[in-house]
Curated annotation (Swiss-Prot):
Domain of life: Bacteria
Cofactors demanded by this protein: Mg(2+); Mn(2+)
Cellular component aspect of the GO annotation: cytosol
Purpose of the protein: DNA ligase that catalyzes the formation of phosphodiester linkages between 5'-phosphoryl and 3'-hydroxyl groups in double-stranded DNA using NAD as a coenzyme and as the energy source for the reaction. It is essential for DNA replication and repair of damaged DNA.
Catalysed transformations (reactions): NAD(+) + (deoxyribonucleotide)n-3'-hydroxyl + 5'-phospho-(deoxyribonucleotide)m = (deoxyribonucleotide)n+m + AMP + beta-nicotinamide D-nucleotide
UniProt-annotated binding residues for Zn(2+): C408, C411, C427, C433
Protein name: DNA ligase
Enzyme Commission code: 6.5.1.2
A biological process term (GO) from this entry: DNA replication
Organism: Corynebacterium glutamicum (strain ATCC 13032 / DSM 20300 / JCM 1318 / BCRC 11384 / CCUG 27702 / LMG 3730 / NBRC 12168 / NCIMB 10025 / NRRL B-2784 / 534)
Xref: NCBIfam families: dnlj, PRK07956.1
Name of the coding gene: ligA
Length: 680
């Protein structure tokens, strides 16, 4: 063997060992690295074997499925009737198109790839005989007792004339915990003295392997069927037909499965779910594409680990590892000092991030992160990236503890908690701390307040740092002469630029706005858009709000004691009142005419609107609901009363159907607004 070949073999051995190790950890509930890091290792090993076929051996990790049942498992081993294969993955559009080109079909099925735990069910003459984990694809753990307490798994299949129950039926499915149930499952676990689960997948995996049946019952496990194994007396012509039969027998199938004939539509489905992955009732990390026709599936066959007739498109990871370079703090608009991680840039959930929140110093200690650690970060959708914790095994002794500052990094004021048991430390210098002032300016310029388009983060910081504004009270008195000292709103020649002129124009127009937006812009702690709408809707002027007794304020729907007290406390401060006085003198809305109060036809109702409506904008439909006493919610749950479906409605419509909620079109919604009833 040449030196080059020897080096290649060493590289292969190293990669194969890492893949085997992390695969075993994953399938036996002790993952050390995010899925994306494992996928990258696996793909690297696959590529090495493709480039050097002589390296591949029959027991290579690229040739096997899952992982052997752990030696310390407390469950009995059980053989699957038919091998339980895995899926090959693609990670970008070109790889998907290549697979579609190699795998032509009259029809494909697209299904969400549930991020849960695989399960194998065997029914004989309709009776549930046993349930097992995937294991290594041939042998899994016998978890029949636990499966019997999952409500979605029927003990007895119900046959029909069209779909008689077969003599033997092996079902493949996925066990999971819904996104909605996960916080409550964690709350129960903490109440029972346990540590919270990191994510729903870990919760499902840990729950399914519990020996205590009562603990399993608490975990709200769900199951969706996504395939068949061995059968006797059942020969469907297509995957779609198989799903119809499963549903008829009482086995749950995915509400998100769709039939597609054009490969271009497959690509579009991948793109759609990339943008809507958080609309599903469960966590998902990809889209599975299957050839629908079962005769074609048989003709295509499978490799030693995966069928050739199916592929999983994996979305960009939401959990990855990177290096924690430093921990710094930022000062928010209410004085809250928040630590954040400065990291080596890393691609996560489709975007490159180099900073992530650490919430507060208690969280830094609880998570046990050290500067210099390799850390796991998570970014879900538009949520700010968060550090989940360190990879302790990768520490080399150079890491160091983070010391939380005692002084504000923006103004030097001594930090303190607002009250004794507060986990957040704050800078009490609210009046003149530049960090607080600039973030308050940015906030009041947002769409939820004055909507001042020309006043962004850089502009706000510039107005404060240059001394053009001492606080927000002078914002509406700004002139072109004031802006001549700006670095953002002037040209190189020292004249006010287009952005500066736009800022002054925006300020004039934003003076006449809704009263609730003015309340939001004041940055009163706890007073967000919902409370502001409620207060403005009841009192109609700033002065009436100031004069209202605390108890009366707290009785306002959507307000309560904490918000009411915070409101009262804010107006006890002289410089706060000076802001309101200067804005009023500049012509900012301080009261609004009391128009005809809309009939409270939606009082006590929670309504979700999904998709576009012809007669409403997004803001106006929300206003229509709130002004009639209803709650405009952004998520569908069992507590939702109505779901209004418009053009291009997303998966919220599907979830509403699954939960059996009342669904309305636009005409029904208008009837509900006008009469309190959606019936014709």
């Amino acid at each position: 063997m040449t030196e080059d070949n020897a080096q290649l073999r060493r590289t292969w051995n190293d990669l194969a060992e890492k893949v085997r190790y992390h695969r075993d950890r994953y399938y036996n509930e002790q993952p050390e690295i995010p899925d994306a890091d494992f996928d990258a290792l696996f793909k690297q090993l696959q590529q090495l074997e493709e480039d050097h076929p002589e390296l591949a051996v029959p027991d290579s990790p690229t040739m096997v499925v899952g992982a052997p049942v752990a030696e310390q498992s407390s469950f009995d081993n059980v053989e699957h009737l038919e091998r339980m294969l895995s899926l090959d993955n693609v990670f970008d559009e070109q790889e998907l198109r290549d697979w579609l080109g190699r795998t032509p079909a009259k029809q494909y099925l697209t299904e969400l790839k549930i991020d849960g735990l695989s399960i194998d069910l065997v029914y004989r003459n309709g009776q549930l005989e046993r349930a097992a984990t995937r294991g290594d694809g041939r042998v899994g753990e016998d978890i029949t007792a636990n499966a019997r307490v999952i409500e979605d798994i029927p003990h007895q299949l119900q046959g029909t004339d069209e779909y008689p129950v077969p003599a033997v039926l092996e079902i493949r499915g996925e066990v999971f915990i819904t996104v909605e149930d996960f916080p409550e499952v964690n709350a129960q676990r903490i109440a029972d003295g346990g540590k919270p689960f990191a994510n729903p997948r870990n919760a499902a995996a840990g729950s399914l392997r519990q020996k205590n049946i009562e603990d399993v019952k608490k975990r709200r496990l769900r199951m969706i069927s996504h395939g068949i194994g061995f059968t006797e007396g059942f020969s469907p012509a297509s995957q779609h037909d198989a799903y119809l039969a499963l549903a008829a027998w009482g086995l749950p199938t995915s509400p998100y499965t769709e039939a597609v004939t054009d490969p271009e539509d497959v690509v579009k489905k991948v793109s759609y779910w990339a943008d809507h992955r958080h609309d599903a009732l469960h966590e998902m990390d990809g889209l599975v594409i299957k050839v629908d026709d079962i005769a074609s599936q048989r003709a295509l066959g499978s490799t030693s680990r995966a069928p050739r007739w199916a592929i999983a498109y994996k979305y960009p990871p939401e959990e990855v590892t990177t290096k924690l370079l430093d921990i710094q703090v930022g000062v928010g608009r209410t004085g809250r000092v928040t630590p954040f991680a400065v990291m080596e840039p890393v691609l996560v959930a489709g975007s490159t991030v180099s900073m992530a929140t650490l919430h507060n110093q208690s969280e830094v200690k609880r998570k046990g992160v050290l500067i210099g650690d390799t850390v796991v970060i998570r970014k879900a959708g538009e949520v700010i990236p968060e550090v989940l914790g360190p990879v302790v095994e990768l520490r080399d002794g150079t890491e160091r503890e983070y010391i939380f500052p005692t002084l504000c990094p923006e103004c030097g004021t001594r930090l303190a908690p607002a009250k004794a048991d507060d986990v957040d430390w704050r800078c009490p210098n609210m009046q003149s701390c530049p960090g607080q002032l600039s973030t308050r300016l940015t906030y009041l310029a947002g769409r939820g307040a004055f909507d001042i388009e020309a006043l962004g983060e850089k502009g706000a910081e510039d107005l404060i740092r240059t001394g053009i504004l001492l606080d927000e009270s002078g914002l509406f008195d700004l002139t072109e002469d004031d802006l001549l000292s700006s670095n953002v709103y002037t040209t190189n020649a020292g004249k006010v630029n287009a952005s500066g002129k736009k800022l002054l124009d925006n300020l004039q127009k934003s003076k006449q706005t809704d009263l609730w937006r003015v309340l939001v812009a004041l940055s009163i702690r706890h007073v967000g858009p919902t409370a502001a709408r409620a207060l403005a809707g009841r009192y109609h002027s700033i002065q009436a709000l100031i004069d209202a007794p605390l108890e009366e304020l707290s009785e306002t729907d959507g307000v309560g004691t904490i918000i009411a007290q915070s409101f009262k406390d804010w107006f006890e401060v002289d410089w706060h009142k000076a802001i309101v006085d200067k804005w009023a003198a500049a012509g900012v809305t301080m009261e609004e005419e009391v128009g005809e109060v809309a009939e409270q036809t939606l009082e006590g109702l929670t309504i979700v609107v999904t998709g576009g409506l012809e007669g409403f904008t997004r803001d106006s439909v929300k206003e229509a609901i709130i002004s009639r006493g209803g709650k405009a919610s952004g998520s569908v749950s069992k507590k939702t009363d109505y779901v209004v479906i418009g053009e291009n409605a997303g998966s919220k419509a599907t979830k509403a159907e699954e939960l059996g909620l009342r669904i309305l079109d636009e005409a029904g919604f208008v009837r509900l607004l006008n009469t309190g009833s959606a019936d014709e």
